[in-house]
Structures are given as structure tokens and as C-alpha cells.
Curated annotation (Swiss-Prot):
Subunit structure: Component of the NDC80 complex, which consists of kpr-1/ndc80, kpr-2/nuf2, kpr-3/spc24 and kpr-4/spc25.
Described purpose of this protein according to its UniProt entry: Acts as a component of the essential kinetochore-associated NDC80 complex, which is required for chromosome segregation and spindle checkpoint activity.
Name of the protein: Probable kinetochore protein ndc80
GO CC field: Ndc80 complex; nucleus
Lineage: Eukaryota, Fungi, Dikarya, Ascomycota, Pezizomycotina
UniProt record similarity statement: Belongs to the NDC80/HEC1 family.
BP term (GO), one: mitotic sister chromatid biorientation
Gene name for this UniProt entry: kpr-1
Keywords: Cell cycle, Cell division, Centromere, Chromosome, Coiled coil, Kinetochore, Mitosis, Nucleus
Disordered, as annotated region: 42-71, 88-150
Length: 743
């Protein structure tokens, strides 16, 4: 990039431009307080092929802001405050307030300053439009779908609500929300907040985005236009009635809104701290020039706004000259870094070229390399042949090793047999010397002596343990005595008993001291090898203090340097009596002071009671006001909720009614069709039943005739059989009667 400066004329020549031709569909919101005035620095000279780079504000103006106009066409052509010439302003349709579209174009071009942002008055590319520079903002707003967009975030999920609520609370605590707003959030804020919590939170978060904005209306009237200006993607799903009654089922929606505003504020803070510069550099986008131009426009625009309306072009040039010079110096500093990098790269390039030349010179002839390659190929073939031969030898040696291992196993067996033979011979030799009884007797004697040694060792260990315990107890008692003596000396020093020159000592030395040995090794020699509970030897300097000499210990009267029951006790009794007398005098004085203090307290208490009575009356009035306000708000919220619920139920009933009518009509048609089908089926079934009935009657009649004939035949058969049987019986009776007569 390069920088030209000649008599106040400046331009920026670069292959890309990020500040001109800003598309108004960008998704980066800007605070409404920044949308105050418009200005465009026009062409400075005819020799430049580009216009000055500028930056448009990317947000909507506040709807409640009025439109002020100031027109002045007096001034030089070097600094123009109207729209850039040869600009296709139809590509930038302003998001102005109502009534702003009726302003004539000529008056807009003549305006020097305006307190309302008009996008069509300040494009930064000459004769180009949004795409004239070939580089647009990468924060493009996606086309909005028709209808109410659906929020893809799982706002109904409890875990997601807890997570974003915790992030919101951490952000509030980090940025001193309660101190700035003088409001403490409810304990259960993330699950069931109050309306006041939401109001303060929304105002505080919006002030983080736009510090200059002032809330003047109710929250349900302020929020919707602000959400449109911020381009909140799901603002259509939020109604005024929901804003006036935050909580319950719709709290997840507002929690997502507050979290989105928090992220937007964090993004703006990161942008102000140049937090995304590294990411742009990694993406291959150089924004150093953009930052320099933006800083220039910000500072120069502010000074230009602060100037008087009647200021001439010379004053304007004089006011802008320091900013132009500062921008030129910034570009020179930026270019110096690139020049330094270029010099380093050029040096590196020269070094690499030199190395390439040296490598080309030092590289041997390709013919020699080919010859070496052929030799290495031949060596490779020879090595492969040698490797094959070595593998064959390896197999041969492995077979030989196996044979040697078998022979080694046989030698081990022979060695074991020789060892067994040696043991047998040794046993035979032993049997010739000592008898078994002598061996048993010696073994028994050795075991008895071993048991005696173990018993004596055990008794010795027990005695050592008891001695160690008594020694440890004595050491603990001595340490406790030293602590008590130290505590006594500390207390005596505090009450003025020691040293002898103290107030209450009266020339007597009342300081206690423990008089024991410090280092004579009398007792340590008897405890060598005895271990204490911690595994350390008990003999040592610490235990030598317990004995006066090698055989005797200390008497109780010899351990301390003073007679406690005689001298010290009498001194303490006398001091106690003296202190009691002084205490009695002090108590009398204190009682008089207490009486005076009680009278003062009674007077203060009377005044405090009067103040509390007035405070109770004030609090009662405040509570009555709050109750009335809460009841009114609750009634309003309940009525709004009831109205919304009834509207939903009415719409639902209408939808259900239309669906029921269509369903009944469909059922009527289906019933008629089914009735006709059943009628046809009934007629066919009736004919079928008549035919079947006639057939069955014919079959019954035929069966009846058959039965009748069968019965007649059976009767005839029965009659014949009866007659036949009767005839046989008569014949038999006659035969029987004949023999009887003969007899």
C-alpha cells in the first residue's frame, strides 16, 4: 500500500477496500446512539481514480429520534459533506424514520450535517455501488424465511437453561451488574425471575451495546423496536404481552434473548480490543489499513461535528490536517514493517539463490553417478547371493545346535546320577561314625537351647518395650512441664511479675526454669538398640535429660528452681488481694459511668423509637403502594393472559369447528354410500335365503316321504316277523303237547 500527501490532498491506493460500498444487509448491529450525523468526504482532486474510504453505520436509526436538517452548500471542493457524486443511491435504501422518505434528493445533497443516519447519503465508492471495490463485508445477513422463524437452540432443555443461565450470571458478576444497576437479582433467577429482574437485565445489557441510549417508555414498548434494530433473528416470536409478563412458560425464550445480547456485547468488546485481528491475519485478510482509516474517520468525524456550522472550508481543512497527517504517519509505520519484511525476504532469496548455485557447482557429473549406480546394483546382486548362502549356513548351524542340546541333556542326566552316588557314599561314611541316638540327643539339646534363647529374647524385648514406654511417658511429662512453665512465664510477664524489676514483682525473681541435664550420655548407653513407636532409637540426647546421673533420676523439688507452694503461692495471694482492692475501686467508677451511659441510652432510645415510628409509617405507605402496584400489574397480566388464552381457544375452536363440519360431511357421504351398498347386499341376501329355504323345504319333504316309506316298510317287516315268530311258537307248543299226551 502507498500513501500520497500533497497540500491536504490524500488518497489510499490498495488492491482492496473494506470500508467503501458497505452493503446495508450486513448482520453487524451498531448502537443507535452512533447514528447521529452523516458526512462524506468527496473527491479531493481529479488526479485520483478512487474516492476516500469511509465507513457507514450498520444499524437502523432509533424510531423515536426526530430528523433535523441543516443545509449549506458553501465550501471548497476539497472537502465535501454531501453525497459522493456519480453514486447510484438507489442501491442504498435508507432505513429512515417515518417521513424521512419524503425529503427531496436535492436537499439531502446540500445538507452539511444531519443528526439522523441516512445510508443513501454516504457511500464511499465513486460510481460503483456496493460492489465497486470488489470487497464486501463478510458479515452478510442471511435472507429471512417467511413467517415466524424457529429457534434451533434447545431452550426448553433444563441443562441448556442452567448452562446459559450460569454463563449469564458469571458475565453479570464479572462486570458489576448489581453495583451499576443498584439491584440484586432474585435467588432463583435462572428458573423463576421477576419482571423487575428482566427489566434491569435488558436495560443493562443494552447499555453494554449502546451506552448512550436512554430508556423513556415502558419496557414492552421499548423492547420490540430495539430487537429489530439489533436484528435479533427470533424477535417475531416475542409479543408485547409476553414482555410485560416475563416468567413461567415463556421464560426460556427471554433467557435465550438475554444470552444472545450477552454474546453480542462480548463480541463488540472483543472487536474493540482487536481480539479478532489474529483470526483475520490467519485467514489472509490484512486489516491494518482498515483500522488506520477507521481511526482517522472516527476522530476526524468527531472534530468535524464539533465545529461551528458557519465554519469555512479553510477551517475545516485546518481541523482535518492533523488527522490526515496522523493517518499518513500510521501508514508509513505500517509500510515500514512490510518494507523490513521485504528486505528480509530479499536477503533470504539471495542466500537461497547462492546456495542453489553452490549446489549446482558441487553436484558431481551425472555419468559418474550412473556408473556408481550400476556398481551398487551389481553389489546388491552379490549381497543377495551372499545372503542366500548365509541363510543356508544358518539352517545348518541350527541343526547342529539341536544335536548339541540333546547331548547336553544326556550329560545333565549323567551328572545327576553321579550326584546321587556321591550322596549315598556320604551317607555310608556318616553311618560309620555317630549313632542315631547321639544325633537325636544333640538335635533335642539344640532345640531346647534355641527355645531358651528365644524366650530370653522375648522377655528382653518386653522389658525394653516397657522401659521405652516409661521413658516416653516421662519425656511427655517433661515436655508438658516445659510448656506449662513457658505458659506461666508468658502470663507472668503479661501481668508484670517477671522480671524482678516488673511492677508487681516487688524485687522478687518469680521466673520458673526447668533444671535438667542437657547432654550427659548416662541413660543413652542402656537404651542402645531400643526402638520407639516411630522406629527411631530411644537412646540419645533427648533421653539423657531424664536422669540426673547414670543411676538416679530427678526429685520433684529439683526440677524447678522455685518453691511453688511456699514463696510463689504467698506472692500470688498478696498480689491477688491488691488487685481485688484496685478492682473494687475501678468497679465503683465504672458503675457511675454506666449510670450516665444508661441515661444517655434512654434518651437515644426515645429518639430512636420516634424515628422507628415514622419509619414504620413510611414503610407502611410504601408497602401499600407496592401492593397496589403489584395487584394492578397482576390484574393487567392476568387479563392479558386471559385475553390471549381466549383468543387462542377461539382460534382453536374455529379450526376444530371447520374440521368437524368437514368430518361430518365426509361421514354423511360415507354413510349414504354404505347404506346403498347394504341395501343391495340385503336384497341379494334375501333372494339367496328364499332360494335356500325352498331347497331346504324340498329336501325336508323328500326326507319325510323317505321316512314315511321306510316306516311303512318297517311295519310290514315287523308284522311279517311277528307272524313268523308266532307261527314257530305255536309249532313248538304243539310239539311239547304231543309227548305229554304220550306219557
Amino acid at each position: 500500500m502507498s500513501q500520497d500527501s500533497n497540500a491536504g490532498l490524500w488518497s489510499v491506493r490498495r488492491p482492496r477496500e473494506t470500508l467503501h460500498g458497505v452493503n446495508l444487509t450486513s448482520g453487524i448491529p451498531a448502537p443507535p446512539s452512533t447514528l447521529k450525523r452523516q458526512s462524506t468526504i468527496g473527491t479531493i482532486g481529479t488526479g485520483h481514480g478512487r474516492s476516500l474510504s469511509g465507513r457507514q453505520s450498520l444499524a437502523l436509526p432509533r424510531p423515536s429520534q426526530p430528523l433535523f436538517q441543516r443545509s449549506s452548500d458553501i465550501g471548497l471542493g476539497s472537502v465535501k459533506r454531501a453525497s459522493v457524486h456519480n453514486m447510484n443511491t438507489s442501491q442504498f435504501k435508507p432505513y429512515g424514520t417515518p417521513g424521512s422518505s419524503g425529503i427531496p434528493r436535492s436537499s439531502q445533497e446540500l445538507d452539511r450535517r444531519s443528526s439522523v443516519y441516512r445510508p443513501s447519503a454516504r457511500p464511499s465508492a465513486v460510481g460503483g455501488g456496493p460492489l465497486a471495490g470488489g470487497h464486501m463485508s463478510f458479515f452478510q445477513q442471511a435472507p429471512q424465511p417467511a413467517g415466524v422463524p424457529r429457534d434451533p437452540r434447545p431452550l426448553k432443555d433444563r441443562q441448556f437453561q442452567n448452562r446459559i443461565g450460569q454463563e449469564l450470571l458469571e458475565y453479570l458478576a464479572k462486570n458489576n451488574f448489581e453495583m451499576e444497576m443498584n439491584h440484586k437479582l432474585s435467588d432463583n433467577f435462572t428458573k423463576s425471575p421477576t419482571q423487575k429482574d428482566f427489566n434491569y437485565l435488558f436495560q443493562w445489557l443494552y447499555h453494554r451495546i449502546d451506552p448512550s441510549y436512554r430508556f423513556q417508555k415502558n419496557i414492552d414498548q421499548e423492547v420490540p423496536p430495539l430487537l429489530k434494530q439489533l436484528r435479533y433473528p427470533y424477535e417475531k416470536s416475542i409479543t408485547k404481552s409476553q414482555i410485560a409478563a416475563v416468567g413461567g412458560q415463556n421464560w426460556s425464550t427471554f433467557l435465550g434473548l438475554l444470552h444472545w445480547m450477552m454474546q453480542l456485547a462480548q463480541m463488540l468488546e472483543g472487536y474493540a480490543r482487536h481480539q479478532y485481528d489474529d483470526a483475520c491475519m490467519e485467514a489472509g485478510v490484512d486489516i491494518a489499513g482498515d483500522q488506520i482509516i477507521f481511526d482517522f474517520l472516527t476522530s476526524a468525524y468527531q472534530d468535524w461535528l464539533n465545529m461551528d456550522d458557519e465554519a469555512g472550508d479553510e477551517d475545516v481543512e485546518r481541523a482535518l490536517q492533523p488527522h490526515v497527517q496522523g493517518m499518513a504517519e500510521a501508514f508509513e509505520r505500517s509500510n515500514a514493517k512490510y518494507i523490513q519484511e521485504l528486505e528480509i525476504l530479499e536477503g533470504e532469496n539471495a542466500r537461497l539463490l547462492k546456495e542453489i548455485q553452490e549446489l549446482e557447482k558441487s553436484t558431481p557429473d551425472p555419468a559418474i553417478l550412473d556408473n556408481h549406480f550400476k556398481i551398487m546394483e551389481e553389489d546388491k546382486i552379490k549381497f543377495e547371493e551372499y545372503n542366500t548362502l548365509a541363510m543356508q549356513r544358518t539352517e545348518k548351524y541350527e541343526n547342529r545346535i539341536q544335536v548339541l542340546r540333546e547331548e547336553l541333556g544326556k550329560l545333565h542326566v549323567e551328572l545327576k546320577e553321579a550326584e546321587e552316588e556321591r550322596r549315598q557314599m556320604q551317607k555310608a561314611v556318616d553311618d560309620q561314625g555317630i549313632s542315631m541316638q547321639d544325633i537325636d540327643r544333640m538335635t533335642s539339646e539344640r532345640e531346647r537351647l534355641q527355645r531358651s534363647i528365644e524366650s530370653a529374647s522375648q522377655r528382653l524385648e518386653d522389658v525394653k518395650k516397657k522401659v521405652a514406654e516409661r521413658e516416653m511417658e516421662a519425656s511427655q511429662r517433661l515436655d508438658e512441664l516445659e510448656r506449662l512453665v513457658e505458659k506461666y512465664n508468658t502470663v507472668a510477664y503479661q501481668i508484670g511479675l517477671i522480671p524482678a524489676t516488673a511492677v508487681n514483682a516487688k524485687g522478687k525473681n518469680l521466673e520458673l526454669q526447668v533444671t535438667v541435664n542437657e547432654g550427659t550420655p548416662n541413660f543413652a548407653s542402656s537404651m542402645q538398640g531400643v526402638l520407639g513407636p516411630n522406629g527411631q532409637p530411644l537412646g540419645g540426647v533427648e533421653n539423657e535429660r531424664l536422669l540426673a546421673d547414670s543411676t538416679t533420676g530427678y526429685q520433684p523439688a529439683h526440677i524447678l528452681n522455685l518453691d511453688l507452694r511456699g514463696q510463689v503461692k504467698n506472692t500470688f495471694l498478696a498480689l491477688r488481694k491488691e488487685v481485688s482492692e484496685r478492682r473494687k475501686v475501678a468497679m465503683d467508677v465504672m458503675m457511675e459511668d454506666h449510670d450516665l451511659l444508661d441515661r444517655a441510652k434512654e434518651a437515644i432510645e426515645d429518639k430512636r423509637n420516634e424515628v422507628e415510628a415514622l419509619g414504620h409509617r413510611v414503610r407502611a405507605a410504601e408497602e401499600e403502594y407496592e401492593k397496589t402496584k403489584e395487584v394492578t400489574n397482576a390484574q393487567k397480566m392476568a387479563s392479558d393472559a386471559q385475553i390471549e388464552k381466549m383468543e387462542k381457544e377461539l382460534a382453536k375452536m374455529r379450526a376444530q369447528l371447520s374440521e368437524s363440519v368437514q368430518l361430518m360431511e365426509q361421514r354423511e357421504m360415507n354413510t349414504n354410500i354404505e347404506y346403498e351398498q347394504l341395501t343391495l347386499r340385503a336384497n341379494a341376501l334375501r333372494e339367496e335365503l328364499h332360494t335356500e329355504t325352498m331347497r331346504m323345504l324340498n329336501d325336508v319333504i323328500k326326507f319325510k316321504m323317505h321316512v314315511q316309506r321306510s316306516l311303512e316298510e318297517y311295519e310290514t317287516f315287523v308284522a311279517d316277523e311277528l307272524e313268523q315268530e308266532l307261527g314257530i311258537d305255536d309249532q313248538e307248543m304243539e310239539d311239547e303237547d304231543t309227548p305229554m299226551a304220550d306219557v
